[in-house]
């Protein structure tokens, strides 16, 4: 029987409830730090407060405090928001921190125990530039062995075995680095063997998701068990997105809550708003793709947590779903996207 492998053990898919499929509760994002504009250097070097928050929202990757999403203050704030998520009807969170992001399994397990939210942890590799010496030269075979071990055997966390429940996020730049190609191929190989879900992180160019899927499918991975993340900042043209959808993977809009004057990690494009995300999802629903859609926030900086003036993990449930209902999306369609699709993606027979 297919089950979902959480950090506290296996559960039946129907117990997941509403699920956020791409989140982080602790990670190191300092690699993406950008020097602040000279005019705002002092504000962005200062501690995040009401007087500096406006600058941080405009330049989130120019505040070193903001990208240190792993210190004690960040963990305390994340726990508070997971509890709020639970209070507002959240059931499960898929934690996408992989090798290179300094995944904190100990904290994820503690959150699962203390909040009652199901957590599914990922294995896999982030971009090559963020790997240490012990991982940066791994072969496809070595990666495959590692991913299989993390899922089947598990890892020791405070004397207990904790097993990962999917492969992800597997991240790449563009053109895709050879190391990252190996990680994508390894994910495809192990997916074929185990049947588990996979989550991909494409670079911020339209060609990237297509190239990732080609490598993954050629390695043997199933399209219907693969999620392509961050498509709300990658493929902006609906016709092109529909063409990509023909490959059969899940289409994930996972930057809900990110609304900004410009996208600091790719200033050549404009980040779409939550309203535009909703409109695009409705277009995809009308094209018959409701069974291929997923939603999340990809929280990875402090300023998106409520303790720092942000929206928290409950934003989709409390703010986005009501707007979707107002625009004609049915409860059945919302349940498909937030409950059924995540369960179908995560369930496998280890």
Curated annotation (Swiss-Prot):
A divalent metal cation 2 binds at residues 169, 201, 230. SUPFAM superfamilies: Metallo-dependent hydrolases (SSF51556). Its EC number is 3.1.-.-. CDD domains: PTE. Its cofactor is a divalent metal cation. GO terms for molecular function: hydrolase activity, acting on ester bonds; zinc ion binding. PROSITE patterns: PHOSPHOTRIESTERASE_1, PHOSPHOTRIESTERASE_2. The keyword Hydrolase applies. It is an enzyme of class 3 (hydrolase). It comes from the Eukaryota. One of its GO terms (biological process) is catabolic process. It holds the Pfam family PTE. Keywords: Hydrolase, Metal-binding. Binds 2 divalent metal cations per subunit. A divalent metal cation 1 binds at residues 22, 24, 169, 298. The keyword DNA repair does not apply. Belongs to the metallo-dependent hydrolases superfamily. Phosphotriesterase family. This is Phosphotriesterase-related protein. It comes from Drosophila sechellia.
């Amino acid at each position: 029987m297919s089950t979902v492998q959480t950090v506290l053990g296996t559960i039946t898919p129907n117990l997941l409830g509403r699920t956020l499929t791409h989140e982080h509760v602790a990670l190191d994002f300092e690699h993406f730090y950008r020097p602040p504009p000279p005019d705002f250097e002092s504000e962005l070097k200062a501690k995040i407060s009401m007087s500096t928050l406006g600058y941080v929202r405009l330049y989130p990757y120019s505040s070193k405090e903001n990208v240190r999403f792993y210190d004690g203050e960040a963990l305390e704030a994340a726990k508070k928001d997971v509890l709020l998520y639970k209070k507002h009807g959240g059931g499960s969170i898929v934690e996408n921190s992989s090798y290179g992001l300094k995944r904190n399994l100990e904290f994820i397990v503690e959150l699962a125990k203390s909040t009652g939210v199901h957590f599914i942890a990922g294995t896999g590799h982030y971009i090559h530039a963020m790997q240490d010496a012990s991982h940066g030269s791994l072969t496809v075979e070595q990666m495959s062995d590692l991913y299989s071990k993390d899922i089947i055997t598990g890892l020791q966390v405070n004397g207990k075995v904790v097993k990962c429940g999917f492969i992800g996020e597997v991240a790449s730049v563009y053109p895709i680095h050879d190391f990252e190609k190996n990680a994508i191929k390894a994910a495809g190989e192990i997916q074929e063997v185990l049947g588990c879900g996979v989550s991909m992180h494409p670079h911020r160019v339209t060609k990237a998701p297509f190239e990732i899927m080609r490598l993954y499918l050629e390695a043997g991975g199933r399209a219907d068990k693969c999620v392509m993340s961050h498509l709300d900042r990658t493929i902006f043209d609906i016709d092109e997105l529909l063409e990509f959808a023909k490959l059969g993977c899940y289409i994930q809009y996972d930057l809900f809550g990110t609304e900004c004057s410009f996208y600091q990690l790719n200033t050549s494009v404009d980040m779409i708003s939550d309203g535009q995300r909703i409109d695009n999802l409705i277009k995809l629903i009308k094209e018959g793709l409701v069974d291929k859609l997923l939603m999340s926030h990809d929280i990875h900086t402090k300023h998106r947590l409520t303790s720092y003036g942000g929206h928290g993990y409950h934003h989709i449930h409390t703010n986005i779903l009501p707007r979707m209902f107002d625009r004609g999306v049915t409860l059945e369609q919302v349940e498909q996207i937030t409950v059924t699709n995540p369960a179908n993606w995560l369930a496998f027979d280890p």
